[in-house]
From Swiss-Prot:
Forms part of the ribosomal stalk which helps the ribosome interact with GTP-bound translation factors. Belongs to the universal ribosomal protein uL11 family. The gene is rplK. One of its GO terms (biological process) is translation. One or more lysine residues are methylated. Part of the ribosomal stalk of the 50S ribosomal subunit. Interacts with L10 and the large rRNA to form the base of the stalk. L10 forms an elongated spine to which L12 dimers bind in a sequential fashion forming a multimeric L10(L12)X complex. Keywords: Methylation, Ribonucleoprotein, Ribosomal protein, RNA-binding, rRNA-binding. One of its GO terms (molecular function) is large ribosomal subunit rRNA binding. This is Large ribosomal subunit protein uL11. Pfam families: Ribosomal_L11 (PF00298), Ribosomal_L11_N (PF03946). GO terms for cellular component: cytosolic large ribosomal subunit. InterPro entries: Ribosomal_uL11, Ribosomal_uL11_bac-typ, Ribosomal_uL11_C, Ribosomal_uL11_C_sf, Ribosomal_uL11_CS, Ribosomal_uL11_N, Ribosomal_uL11_N_sf.
């Protein structure tokens, strides 16, 4: 018989840098999870993605055990890295802060495809292009 899930915790943690300090400690402490165990497992799983923020969904069971699923980094982080900028535009409609190529957009869409609500790379490209537009990033052909 399957274990009963008592709590789902969603966090965004820098890859390879989970520690018991906030926000990880308080969120998992409330769920009565072994925090050092989670931190070591998360850091081991995400050590190859250093420099990105990784969304994670933690399922906590009745017996205080847990499992977690990592997602792909947020599209905005991937776009900022591709455009080599620190932040998006404060006024995206009038001020463009950077440009990226269609090939860079497709790379990001391929990476994000499994987490997006899209069945094809073309649909994923449109979703990522919308995020880029809202950040003030121009896409050139």
């Amino acid at each position: 018989m399957a274990k009963k899930v008592v709590k789902m915790v969603k966090l965004q943690i820098p890859a390879g840098k989970a520690n018991p300090a906030p926000p990880v400690g308080p969120a998992l402490g409330q769920a009565q999870v072994n925090i050092p165990s989670f931190c070591s497992q998360f850091n081991e799983t995400t050590k190859d993605q250093m420099g990105f923020i990784i969304p994670v969904i933690i399922s906590v069971y009745e017996d205080r055990t847990f499992t977690f699923v990592t997602k792909t980094p947020p599209a905005s982080d991937l776009l900022k890295k591709a455009a080599k900028i620190d932040a998006g535009s404060a006024n995206a409609k009038q001020t463009k802060v950077a440009t990226i190529s269609k090939s860079q957009l497709q790379e990001i869409a391929n990476l994000k495809l499994r987490d997006l609500n899209a069945y094809s790379v073309e649909q994923a490209c449109k979703i990522i292009a919308g995020t880029a537009r809202n950040m003030g990033i121009l896409i050139e052909d």
